[in-house]
From Swiss-Prot:
One of its GO terms (molecular function) is 2 iron, 2 sulfur cluster binding. Residues 28-119 form the 2Fe-2S ferredoxin-type domain. Part of an enzyme complex containing four subunits: a flavoprotein, an iron-sulfur, cytochrome b-556, and a hydrophobic anchor protein. Keywords: 2Fe-2S, 3Fe-4S, 4Fe-4S, Electron transport, Iron, Iron-sulfur, Metal-binding, Oxidoreductase, Transport, Tricarboxylic acid cycle. It catalyses: a quinone + succinate = fumarate + a quinol. Residues 160-190 form the 4Fe-4S ferredoxin-type domain. GO terms for biological process: respiratory electron transport chain; tricarboxylic acid cycle. NCBIfam families: dhsB, PRK05950.1. This is Succinate dehydrogenase iron-sulfur subunit. It comes from the Bacteria. InterPro entries: 2Fe-2S_ferredoxin-like_sf (IPR036010), 2Fe-2S_ferredoxin-type (IPR001041), 2Fe2S_fd_BS (IPR006058), 4Fe4S_Fe-S-bd (IPR017896), 4Fe4S_Fe_S_CS (IPR017900), Beta-grasp_dom_sf (IPR012675), Helical_ferredxn (IPR009051), SDH/FRD_Iron-Sulfur (IPR050573).
Length: 259
């Protein structure tokens, strides 16, 4: 039988339990992953109690309340607070969500919060997305043309423009890629659902003139074909997009140009 031994500093330990708010009757318990690279200590799970009668309805509201009123050392990303910027993606109650639009009423019992899976951690709930962004850049997510730029806009029919619906709305939160087991196993070479969704968005753009080159760049055993239609990406996308369908469409295009 294979035996695996985790590095000593990877084992999570029980952290600090903060006191409950006095006089509160509607209290939720939050178990939150904590790790500070500057201390050299193991990751830990700290426990906080929040008076929900004095807190907004979203998970991000509770995190902000914890940081402002209980523990200012808690670190996480956030910005727009309305599901547009993608900054506050994290693993909540076992699934990847945007904390700003994930309601407390969707969670039963304790609230368990971790950083996005698979990614290196910068600190606490902040993942290092350097590799994720590099993969996105590798698909050249912009218009490539040889035709001289027109005096006005690049014209596009209503039908061609409609093909981009369900693709351009991605907020680059990384929830889909970090929910994908294939990305966990082959993240160094498999581009992942987010990057491939963007690749398809430009491949089918009627104004783009580099379709062949884009498909050539994806003709690789790992970049595209490590997708095994597990569908975690589609199930977890906070914008309701379907990266798995986009990936399947690219595969069909690969076959169509050969047959």
């Amino acid at each position: 039988m294979v035996q695996l031994t985790l590095p000593k500093n990877s084992r999570m330990r029980v952290g600090k339990t903060w006191p409950k708010p006095e006089g509160a009757t509607n209290v939720r318990r939050f178990n939150i992953y904590r790790w500070d690279p500057d201390t050299g200590e193991n990751p830990r799970i700290d426990t906080y109690f929040v008076d929900m009668d004095k807190c907004g309805p979203m998970v991000l509201d509770a995190l902000i309340k914890i940081k402002n009123e209980i523990d200012p050392t808690l670190t996480f990303r956030r910005s727009c607070r309305e599901g547009i910027c993608g900054s506050c993606a994290m693993n909540i109650d076992g699934g990847n969500h945007l904390a700003c639009i994930y309601g407390m009423d969707e969670i039963k019992g304790d609230v368990n919060i971790y950083p996005l899976p698979h990614m290196p951690v910068v600190k606490d709930l902040v993942p290092d997305l350097t590799h994720f962004y590099a993969q996105h850049a590798s698909v050249q997510p912009y218009l490539i043309t040889e035709t001289p730029t027109p005096d006005k806009e690049w014209r596009q029919s209503i039908e061609d423009r409609k093909k981009l619906d369900g693709l351009y709305e991605c907020v680059m939160c990384a929830s889909c890629s970090t929910a994908c087991p294939s990305y966990w196993w082959n993240g160094d070479r498999y581009l992942g659902p987010a990057a491939l969704l963007h690749a398809y968005r430009w491949i089918i753009d009627s104004r783009d003139e580099a379709t062949g080159e884009r498909l050539d760049s994806l003709e690789d055993p790992f970049k595209l074909y490590r997708c095994h239609t597990i569908m975690n990406c589609t199930n977890t996308c906070p914008k309701g997009l379907n990266p798995a369908k986009a990936i399947a469409s690219i595969k069909h295009m690969m076959v169509d140009r050969i047959v």
